[in-house]
Each structure stands twice: as structure tokens, then as C-alpha cells.
């Protein structure tokens, strides 16, 4: 049975269909998939209209920074701190996993920051793609690596 507070909507993007879910507390997840496996909620694009518009503007190049409430209620506190730190990385720039860990208040937790980025349910609003290895290589990522490359290239113009 769907969570009565959870709403979903979808958007076609250059990297595929994205399914958004959210609550009154904010945007909860973004999943890139043809169908939203495991995301059950009331289909309500109006409830997620700000997120849909901002994502469309991001992919068209008109938006460089998101201004959305996020529902991080089910996220571990360290992961939430890492996500907030990643959101400070400007459009078109990158930071290492170690730098993001330090920004999140845990300078010795680069690997843990990497695991948090790999599990981030809110890309590209939380710009996990901007977090790379200290040697400048883009490293791995939860979604396919081509998506990370595409997002980095998109922001570099």
C-alpha cells in the first residue's frame, strides 16, 4: 500500500527518465529508471512541480544551483552532512572525497564520504557527480559511470 504522504512524479531528461518522490518535508529521492521500482506513492506532479521545473532548468543549462527542501529523515547523520557539503561545490567544479569529508566535519573519512556519495538518493540535486578522487580521476559512482561523465561534461559546457 502506498505511503499516503509520499508523492511521485517523473521527468524525461538527457540521461533517461527520472522518478522523483517526496513528502511534505521535501524531496526524498530521485531515481533514474524506466519504471520506479520500489517507489510507491501517489502520482502527483503538482506536489513536486518546483523540483520538476528546477531539474528541467538544470538539464537545459539555465539552472546552476538547486533551491529545494530535501527530506533527509531516513538518512544517516554523517551521510546527510556529506550531502550538504557536496551541495556547496559550485557548478562546473569538483572536490575530492577527502575535501568533502572535511567539509562535513570528518576530515579522515574520505572512504566513508565515497560510500555516502555512492548511495546518495538525490542526484543531481545533491551533486555527487562533482566529487572525485584526489588524483583528479572521476572514480566510481552508484549510477552508471557514463552518467557521472555526462553530468560533469554538461556543467563544463
Question: Predicted segment positions?
Answer:
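Basic nucleic-acid-binding alpha-helical/helix-turn surface characteristic of O6-alkylguanine DNA
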Residues: 1-108, 154-157
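Short amphipathic alpha-helical/adjacent loop interface patches that line ligand
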Residues: 52, 117, 121, 145
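Regulatory, non-catalytic segments
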Residues: 108-123
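Extracytoplasmic/periplasmic beta-strand context in beta-sandwich domains
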Residues: 115, 130, 149-150
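Short Lys/Arg-enriched helix C-cap and helix-to-coil transition segments
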Residues: 124-131
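…primarily DNA-binding HTH/wHTH and HhH modules…
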Residues: 134-157
Amino acid at each position: 500500500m502506498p505511503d499516503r504522504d509520499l508523492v511521485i512524479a517523473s521527468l524525461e531528461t538527457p540521461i533517461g527518465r527520472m522518478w522523483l518522490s517526496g513528502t511534505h518535508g521535501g524531496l526524498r529521492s530521485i531515481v533514474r529508471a524506466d519504471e520506479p521500482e520500489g517507489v510507491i506513492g501517489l502520482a502527483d506532479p503538482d506536489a513536486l512541480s518546483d523540483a520538476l521545473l528546477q531539474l528541467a532548468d538544470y538539464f537545459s543549462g539555465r539552472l546552476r544551483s538547486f533551491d529545494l527542501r530535501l527530506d533527509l529523515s531516513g538518512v544517516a547523520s554523517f551521510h546527510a552532512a556529506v550531502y550538504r557539503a557536496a551541495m556547496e561545490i559550485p557548478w562546473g567544479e569538483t572536490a575530492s572525497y577527502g575535501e568533502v569529508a572535511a567539509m562535513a566535519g570528518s576530515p579522515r573519512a574520505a572512504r566513508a564520504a565515497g560510500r555516502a556519495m555512492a548511495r546518495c538518493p538525490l542526484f543531481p540535486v545533491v551533486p555527487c557527480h562533482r566529487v572525485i578522487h584526489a588524483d583528479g580521476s572521476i572514480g566510481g559512482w552508484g549510477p552508471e559511470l557514463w552518467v557521472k561523465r555526462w553530468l560533469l561534461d554538461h556543467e563544463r559546457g
